[in-house]
């Protein structure tokens, strides 16, 4: 296969940076669904530095799926590792460079002490490979936060962070300068960590010593296990001025400043010692203001002093200026000195201790305090002359009070008797009393009723809205706003009952009819074949709306069915507008958004109402998915005004239609339904189609918020789950919709998945694939992975039962489940299940059921009078059959000669008029029947080609070859008089029109080839060297790995290269030159018929990335047309012309679309009456006969090719030359005042008001070698991300107008369409939305640019790992990848043998091993033929043994190899239990060559 590509220019080699497939894939619609945007907390750059403004969480589990770096704030005594307790965790997502510089605003008013030399200690423990790069990522985030002035100088700072499975915390006493800590201590730790050995389970740094008090202590700790208990324990030690001991440690000396004197110097100042050494510098003896306050006392009361962190009785006595004996006398309680608490008041003289307890306020409310980072009931009580029991008693009615065991940071609590306070605001609260800006109510007992949720949804104790048990279960433990551990509780609109309303007079049975079904390969239904007795309402889906709000039905088959639809009797005939594709495709999504606005709603409503009235229909159904939706992939977020606009539009529409029916479709998820003012809408319209199907599907993959109890959204769940359907019915009826107006969705199709494990088919078992790509088997007719009709399911059950492994009713979901071909799992509803559901919905007072869709239920024979479905479809597309009820017609085309007015050489009429008057449609129908009869017979000699046989039947010349372009082609223009037309010839004047159409189609393809292989080839060949010199100083290697990327580009380029040319060509043809609706319809249908097939050919060329799949046969066929880069499209269109005239049913269908109604023949745009014939123009025969492209046609192809070529090739060449371009998501808005600081060295672009940068991790992230020999003494900056070579030229003035912004925005759109994840597939040009966007030369179409996108934090972590593990650079998506640990083995080819028993290790323990080593540089070098247990946690051990020396003495395995195996087995083994065990064999690196390695997972 190599010779095919040898010699091809580097510019053609396409990068892995191009498009993602199934555009606008559906999104989740289950009641619990939340968008991908909710996986991580709000960005730090948005929330600001104050933790109380960050997102709030009640446990760490809700943050486990965020793969970004996060900063946390929580109380020191809040044990956040305790999964059985309730917590308050403040969190924000750190992208890198999140903090503005506010350091000057915190400069203390008092002059700092002079500079001191101090000793910093770095300590660590070593057990297994470490993650210094993750450590550094968190240190950098904390350093920036501290150094830029975001800690208060008036109080001790405690801050926490997490990145992946690395946790960290920083403690800074309030007498230390934050700038010193950030720029000296933490920066030195970052620098030194580059030289660590990669084996640190924990890393700690402290400034602490025997003479330090807690105000002068600094500490940092990072752990590799992702927990915080040890960090909080360290903070408690430092807050008591207790230093930590380490297994290993080193020290370095640096300078710092103290903003107040240490207690040790104060003690010395009150004795005979003049000073004491602390950190190597004499500290002056001086009493601070803080230490001297409260020394004066009133009569009868003692003078007091306040206990500081780390104090002793001796230290306090010194500050009091009294002896130890006197201090003991004044404070004589037993064991007094062993029970000192920070904040506690003590006596410094004789007398009674004053009462410092606060008093209630004048209005009767209690005195309050806000709980600080390091405060507990104990410290608060001590500071206020109270006991813990007092605190607990005061707060029995305080919002959120759960007792002293676990008080939360920033809580407002009572420290006196009195009525409870207003709770503290929570920045992201949506409901309840903690919504920012909430005013104090008159009745404090009604706090829970404040700020109710939209749709009357449940409000949990954290102020979040939802409709599932997680939000709606009240687990109050006493005080208002509390919940039991492990729950979120509920404070308002609790419960999940369905509100039963007024049942309808007649229970509705609604059916949807898919008018677009005839685009399938099989499974058809004429609308007359619908069992009308089953339905009260029949919805015809869908009718088109243009961008100027005109109504039409553009598809001929749909138009034919619509005419039949108008004649049905029985059910109400409802016409539907919208649908998922219409609502979400780039070309149409704005129609509803703008059409319902105040400026346009009257026009849109009037046009729809007129269409309904003119066609004598019974009503209209609007399916907008969805107003105000925040996260439709590839689309800007919907505006919040859209819901009310929709309501106002429906009011106008209903007023215009009067007694006729108006309905809408609505989603079953709170996430999307909250954009609808659904209660108000329900009062305007007649009923709501409630879409309780598609609750789940492939789109759930990767979203932890899509499926209850499923951490990654990839569990096998029914799309018609009964439990979730009831939750949805509760949602909509609680929202205020009368149940009698709710028509509940049922389905006649299933959603299918490819199972991970053939033996695991329950709701916790997993499926494979990504959100945009299903591995489920496609059925023949629906032809969509993940989607299969009931008809196809029943066909399997009835006629292919040997393929069915399981078939049963799942009682929990009340769904039919079928497993077939071992690993295909599908959930669906049989007629029996639908009948059960119908009875239940009737009992609940619902308004009816709606079935999607009638045409999916069973296979139907072609209607009476039609031979078969292909024949009927062909006739529908040709327009030769008249809808039933309009009368029959007979053809007369053979009776019309060349002298007919409509057949003269100079056309006097429009193409459509000529076609119809000469009965060309009848001629075409007869010719096709004759051809099929000829085609299907056995022939002894050579069979004529399709075009040759048609010519023969028409009386034309022989040796015709319209299906070829090369030198052997022959498809001439033939005038009417040259055909053998006359009595008995079975031909007529229509022959010329049909043959003119053939010629025009052949001419178009020939001109395209002419332009492609001559002019464009010359241009590209002349500019390739400039491309390479500008963007790639090092040429790419010539290897087979590029094959898939080249073919991706060929596939992508079809609509861009061919589309523009054909678009221009068609617009010159008379039938498509006017701006009329008919002309536009002709243009759209012909363009689709021409280009859909080449796009399919191009897509099918891609195959797989295995070079062995590129067979010699494929190569030979492809090589005939591919010599240079342009020949890819030359082959595609040459092959497509061959297919177009091959005489198969599919080709005939395409030709019928192209030539029907005279779309390819001559004529004038509009008929002119005969007397005005002098105004008519004669046709130019010479121009019509040319097959060489004109200059303008060459320019059209050149523009399309070069735009696609440069846009695709430039990122490809960067990558081919060893660079790794990626997009930095700065997290900043485009109007951020500090944004320019981060864009001065890198090219940037804005998308949806967010700033992104194009960057390259060139070279080493930290290129320094340490040779100074002093820990902490080496200053070496990290490398900055680089710009890409030649990027300055991408300013839109060259390279076909390509701009840096196009590369950035295109990559970001791809990333967003893939659910904010990298790695989405290449674009599918057979998708109509993608095709149209590419045809418009939109190189930012999602997927065309596929550079990875991530935060600077993640990118730098991967970059640093690559310094030590070069293979990391070869990982997909580098540097935005997470799987960048060291690897030596081919885990993808490992064998897996499960041996799970009741005594096997816990899966969770094995996954902790993953947490501990994921992304690390860890590796093991072990002797062969010896068993080793190399990774352990809890009950789980991962062991290895090299087998058979094969010249090796040692074998290597890396951390990533272990991670890959444990991840795979944790998904495939255990079968729903919590344990797993087993073994396998794989190939790994030996010290000489590849080595067989046996691995095992077993109990320790």
From Swiss-Prot:
Region: Disordered, residue numbers: 1164-1193
Its EC number(s): 3.2.1.14
Changes seen on gene knockout: Leads to a decreased expansion rate of decayed lesion on infected fruits.
Keywords (A to Z) from UniProt: Carbohydrate metabolism, Chitin degradation, Chitin-binding, Disulfide bond, Glycoprotein, Glycosidase, Hydrolase, Polysaccharide degradation, Repeat, Secreted, Signal, Virulence
Extra remark beyond the main annotation: In plants, chitin acts as a microbe-associated molecular pattern (MAMP) that is recognized by lysin motif (LysM)-containing plant cell surface-localized pattern recognition receptors (PRRs) that activate a plethora of downstream immune responses.
Domain notes: The LysM (lysin motif) domains are small globular domains involved in binding chitin in eukaryotes. LysM12 contains one LysM domains.
Protein name: Secreted chitinase LysM12
């Amino acid at each position: 296969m190599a010779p095919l590509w040898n010699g091809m220019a580097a510019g053609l080699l396409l990068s892995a940076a191009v498009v993602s497939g199934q555009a606008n894939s559906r999104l989740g619609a289950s009641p619990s669904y939340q968008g991908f945007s909710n996986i991580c907390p709000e960005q730090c750059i948005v929330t600001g530095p104050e933790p109380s403004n960050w997102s709030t969480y009640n446990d760490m589990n809700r943050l486990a799926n965020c793969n970004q770096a996060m900063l946390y704030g929580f109380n020191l005594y809040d044990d956040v590792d305790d999964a059985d307790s309730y917590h308050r965790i403040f969190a924000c997502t750190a992208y890198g460079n999140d903090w503005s510089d506010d350091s000057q605003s915190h400069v203390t008013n008092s002059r700092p002490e002079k500079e001191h030399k101090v000793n910093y200690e770095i300590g660590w423990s070593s057990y297994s490979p470490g993650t210094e790069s993750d450590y550094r990522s968190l240190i950098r985030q904390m350093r920036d936060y501290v150094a830029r002035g975001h800690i208060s100088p008036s109080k001790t700072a405690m801050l926490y962070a997490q990145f992946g499975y690395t946790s960290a915390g920083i403690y800074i006493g309030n007498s230390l300068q934050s700038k010193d800590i950030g720029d000296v201590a933490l920066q030195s730790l970052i620098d030194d960590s580059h030289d660590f050995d990669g084996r640190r389970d924990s890393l700690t740094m402290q400034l602490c010593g025997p003479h330090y008090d807690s105000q002068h202590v600094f500490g940092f700790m990072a752990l590799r296990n992702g927990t915080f208990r040890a960090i909080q324990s360290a903070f408690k030690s430092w807050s008591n001025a207790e230093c930590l001991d380490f297994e290993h440690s080193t020290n370095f000396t640096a300078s710092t400043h103290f903003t107040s004197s240490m207690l040790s110097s104060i003690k010395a100042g009150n004795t005979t010692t003049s000073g004491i050494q602390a950190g190597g510098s004499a500290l002056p003896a001086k009493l601070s203001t803080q230490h001297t306050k409260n020394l004066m006392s009133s009569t009868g009361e003692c003078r007091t002093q306040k206990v500081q962190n780390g104090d002793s009785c001796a230290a306090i006595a010194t500050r009091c200026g009294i002896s130890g004996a006197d201090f003991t006398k004044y404070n004589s309680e037993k064991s007094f000195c062993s029970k000192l608490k920070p904040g506690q008041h003590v006596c410094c003289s004789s007398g009674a201790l004053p009462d410092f307890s606060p008093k209630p306020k004048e209005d009767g409310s209690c005195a309050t305090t806000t709980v600080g980072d390091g405060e507990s009931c104990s410290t608060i009580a001590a500071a206020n002359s109270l006991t813990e029991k007092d605190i607990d008693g005061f707060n029995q009615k305080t919002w959120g009070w759960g007792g002293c065991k676990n008080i939360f940071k920033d809580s407002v609590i009572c420290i006196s008797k009195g009525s409870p306070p207003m709770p503290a605001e929570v920045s992201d609260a949506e409901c309840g009393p903690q919504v920012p800006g909430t005013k104090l109510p008159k009745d404090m007992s009604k706090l829970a009723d404040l700020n109710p949720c939209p749709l009357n949804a449940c409000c949990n104790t954290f102020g979040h809205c939802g409709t599932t048990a997680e939000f709606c279960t009240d687990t109050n433990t006493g005080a208002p706003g509390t919940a039991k551990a492990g729950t979120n509780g509920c404070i308002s609109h609790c419960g999940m009952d369905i509100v039963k309303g007024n049942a309808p007079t007649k229970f509705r049975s609604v059916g949807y009819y898919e008018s677009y079904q005839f685009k399938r390969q099989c499974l058809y239904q004429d609308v007359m074949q619908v069992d009308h007795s089953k339905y009260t309402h029949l919805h015809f889906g869908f009718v088109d709306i243009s961008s100027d709000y005109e109504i039409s039905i553009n598809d001929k088959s749909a138009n034919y069915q619509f005419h039949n639809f108008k004649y049905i009797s029985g059910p109400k005939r409802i016409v539907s507008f919208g649908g998922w594709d219409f609502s979400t495709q780039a070309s149409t999504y704005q129609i509803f958004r703008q059409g319902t606005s105040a400026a346009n709603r009257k026009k849109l409503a009037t046009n729809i109402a007129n269409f309904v009235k003119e066609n004598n229909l019974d009503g209209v159904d609007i399916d907008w998915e969805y107003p105000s939706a925040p996260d439709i992939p590839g689309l800007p977020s919907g505006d919040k005004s859209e819901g009310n606009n929709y309501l106002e539009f429906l009011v106008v529409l209903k007023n215009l239609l009067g007694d006729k029916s108006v309905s809408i479709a609505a989603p079953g998820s709170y996430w999307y339904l909250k954009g609808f003012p659904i209660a108000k809408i329900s009062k305007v319209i007649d009923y709501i189609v409630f879409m309780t199907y598609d609750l789940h599907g492939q789109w759930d993959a990767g979203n932890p918020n899509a499926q209850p109890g499923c951490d990654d959204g990839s569990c096998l769940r029914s799309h018609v789950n009964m439990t979730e359907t009831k939750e949805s019915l509760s949602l909509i009826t609680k929202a205020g919709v009368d149940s009698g107006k709710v028509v509940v969705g049922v389905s006649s199709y299933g959603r299918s998945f490819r199972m991970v494990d053939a033996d695991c088919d329950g709701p916790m078992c997993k499926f494979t694939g990504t959100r945009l790509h299903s591995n489920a088997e496609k059925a023949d007719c629906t032809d969509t992975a993940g989607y299969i009709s009931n008809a196809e399911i029943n066909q399997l059950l009835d006629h292919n039962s040997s393929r069915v492994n399981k078939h049963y009713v799942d009682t929990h979901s009340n769904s039919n489940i079928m497993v077939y071909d071992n690993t295909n799992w599908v959930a669906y509803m049989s007629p029996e299940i639908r009948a059960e559901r119908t009875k239940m919905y009737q009992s609940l007072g619902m308004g009816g059921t709606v079935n999607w869709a009638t045409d999916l239920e069973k296979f139907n024979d072609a209607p009476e009078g039609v031979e078969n479905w292909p024949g009927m479809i062909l006739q529908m597309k040709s327009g030769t059959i008249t809808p039933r009820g309009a009368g029959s017609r007979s053809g007369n085309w053979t009776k019309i000669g060349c002298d007919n007015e409509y057949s003269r050489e100079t056309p006097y009429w429009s193409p459509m008029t000529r076609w119809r008057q000469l009965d060309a449609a009848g001629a075409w129908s007869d010719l096709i029947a004759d051809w099929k009869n000829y085609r299907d017979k056995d022939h002894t000699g050579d069979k004529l080609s399709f075009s040759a046989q048609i010519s023969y039947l028409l009386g034309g010349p022989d040796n015709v070859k319209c299906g070829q372009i090369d030198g052997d082609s022959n498809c001439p223009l033939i005038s009417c008089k040259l055909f053998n037309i006359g009595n008995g010839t079975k031909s007529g004047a229509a022959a010329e029109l049909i043959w003119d159409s053939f010629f025009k189609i052949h001419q178009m393809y020939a001109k395209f080839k002419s332009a492609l292989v001559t002019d464009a080839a010359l241009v590209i060949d002349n500019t390739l060297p400039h491309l390479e010199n500008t963007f790639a100083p090092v040429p790419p290697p010539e290897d087979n790995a590029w094959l898939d990327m080249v073919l991706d580009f060929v596939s992508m380029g079809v609509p861009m290269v061919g589309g523009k040319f054909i678009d221009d060509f068609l617009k010159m043809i008379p039938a498509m030159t006017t701006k009329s609706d008919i002309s536009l319809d002709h243009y759209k249908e012909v363009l689709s018929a021409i280009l859909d097939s080449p796009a399919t050919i191009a897509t099918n060329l891609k195959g797989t990335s295995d070079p062995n799949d590129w067979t010699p046969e494929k190569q030979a066929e492809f090589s005939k047309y591919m010599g240079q880069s342009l020949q890819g499209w030359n082959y595609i269109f040459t092959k497509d012309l061959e297919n177009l005239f091959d005489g198969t049913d599919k080709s005939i269908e395409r030709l019928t679309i192209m030539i029907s109604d005279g779309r390819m023949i001559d004529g004038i745009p509009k008929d002119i009456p005969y007397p005005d014939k002098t105004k008519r123009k004669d046709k130019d025969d010479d121009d019509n006969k040319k097959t060489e492209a004109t200059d303008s046609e060459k320019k059209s192809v050149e523009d399309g090719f070069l735009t696609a070529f440069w846009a695709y090739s430039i990122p490809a060449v960067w990558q081919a030359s060893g660079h790794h371009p990626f997009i930095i998501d700065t997290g900043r808005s485009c109007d951020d005042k500090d944004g320019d600081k981060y864009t001065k060295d890198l090219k940037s672009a804005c998308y949806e008001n967010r700033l992104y940068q194009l960057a390259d991790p060139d070279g080493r992230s930290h290129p320094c070698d340490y040779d100074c020999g002093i820990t902490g003494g080496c200053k070496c900056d990290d490398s900055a991300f680089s710009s890409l070579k030649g990027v300055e030229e991408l300013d839109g003035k060259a390279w076909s107008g390509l701009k840096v912004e196009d590369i950035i925005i295109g990559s970001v759109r791809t990333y967003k369409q893939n659910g904010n994840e990298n790695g989405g597939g290449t674009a599918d040009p057979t998708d109509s939305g993608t095709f149209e966007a590419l045809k418009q030369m939109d190189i930012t179409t999602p997927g065309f640019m596929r550079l990875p996108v991530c935060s600077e934090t993640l990118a730098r972590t991967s970059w640093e790992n690559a310094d030590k593990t070069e293979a990391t650079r070869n990982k997909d998506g580098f540097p935005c990848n997470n799987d960048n640990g060291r690897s030596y083995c081919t885990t993808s080819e490992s064998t897996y043998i499960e041996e799970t028993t009741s005594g096997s290790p816990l899966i969770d323990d094995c996954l902790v091993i993953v947490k501990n080593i994921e992304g690390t540089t860890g590796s093991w070098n072990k002797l062969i033929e010896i068993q080793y247990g190399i990774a352990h946690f809890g009950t789980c051990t991962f062991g290895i043994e090299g087998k058979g020396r094969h010249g090796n003495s040692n074998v290597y395995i890396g951390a990533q190899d272990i991670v890959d195996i444990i991840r795979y087995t944790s998904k495939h083994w255990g079968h729903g239990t919590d344990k797993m065990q087993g073994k396998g064999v794989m190939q790994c690196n030996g010290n000489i060559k590849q080595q067989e390695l046996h691995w095992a997972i077993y109990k320790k």
